[in-house]
Swiss-Prot record:
Core subunit of respiratory chain NADH dehydrogenase (Complex I) which is composed of 45 different subunits. GO terms for biological process: mitochondrial electron transport, NADH to ubiquinone; mitochondrial respiratory chain complex I assembly. Belongs to the complex I subunit 1 family. It is a multi-pass membrane protein. The gene is MT-ND1. The lineage of its organism: Eukaryota, Metazoa, Chordata, Craniata, Vertebrata. It holds the Pfam family NADHdh. The chain crosses the membrane at residues 2-22, 76-96, 98-118, 140-160, 171-191, 217-237, 253-273, 294-314. It comes from Ateles paniscus (Black spider monkey). This is NADH-ubiquinone oxidoreductase chain 1.
Amino acid sequence: MFMVNLLLLIIPALIAMAFLTLTERKILGYMQFRKGPNIVGPYGMLQPIADAMKLFMKEPLLPTTSASTLYMTAPTLALSIALLMWSPLPMPHPLINFNLGLLFMLATSSLAVYSILWSGWASNSNYALIGALRAVAQTISYEVTLAIILLSTLLMSGSFNLQSLITTQEHSWLLLPSWPMAMMWFTSTLAETNRAPFDLTEGESELVSGFNIEYAAGSFALFFMAEYMNIIMMNALTTTIFLAMPYNMASSELYTMNFMTKTLLLTTLFLWIRTAYPRFRYDQLMHLLWKKFLPLTLALCMWYISMPALTSGIPPQT
C-alpha cells in the first residue's frame, strides 16, 4: 500500500513538473509578444512529452576527463532529493507524518547542494566548477534566512509538525501577522531554487551554462526536472506555512483544490518574476542577504520570542 501511495505522489508531481515547463514557455512567450510552443498537439499541449522523448532518446555523453561515477550519480541524486522533499508535505495527508517535518525538509534541501557541487567538480570544467561554487555559496547563504524565518513561524505554531502549522492558521493566515517575513521567505526561495533574478549559477555571459554545462540528454533532463520539482515544492511549502486553509475531515477534496490553486498562483509568480527582472550581480545578491535580510529576520525572530513573555503567554503546546 505504501508503494501505491508513493506512486500516487510521485507521478502527479512529475506530470505537474512537465507541464510547468510548458507554462513557463507560454508565459515567457506572451510577455515577449509571441505565441510560445503551439505546434506539438493542440495549443502545444504535447510539447513536454516531445521534449522528454527527445532528451531521453539522445545518446548520453561522458566527457573523457570527467570523474565518471560522480558525474553520473549527481543528476540522479538531485532528482531523488527533490522527490524526497514531498514526503512530509500535507496535501492534506502526508506520505510520511514526521513530528519534525519542517526540520526534515530544511535538512533535505541542504543536501541538494551536494549534487550541484559533485556535478561541477566531476565535469572537470572551469565553467562548471565556478557555477557549482556559486550555487553552493548562494544556497547555503539563503538557507540561513530560511531557517530563521522557519524558527519564527515555529514559535507561533509551537511544533515542527506541518499539520500543526495548518491548525495554527484555523482563524487567519500566518501571512497577515508576519508579512515582512513572508516577503523575505518568498525572495529567499527564489535564491534557494537558483531562479531569476538570482540565477547566477548559469550566467550565460560569464559561465555559458553553469554547473550543468557538460551534461546532455537524460542526465541534463534529470537536473532540469529537479529544478522544476523544487520550484513547485517550495511554493507548496510557502502555501502550507503562510496561506494554509484549515483542514476539515469532511472537506479533504476542497483542501486539496485550495492548496493546488495557491501553489499554482505562487509558481506563476515565480515565472512572471523571471520575465520581469534582470539578473542581479553576485555582490548585490550577497549584500541583499547578509546586510538586509539577515538583520531583519533576526530582529523579527527576537520580536516573536519576546512577545509571549511580554504578554505572559506561551505558544500552544502539542
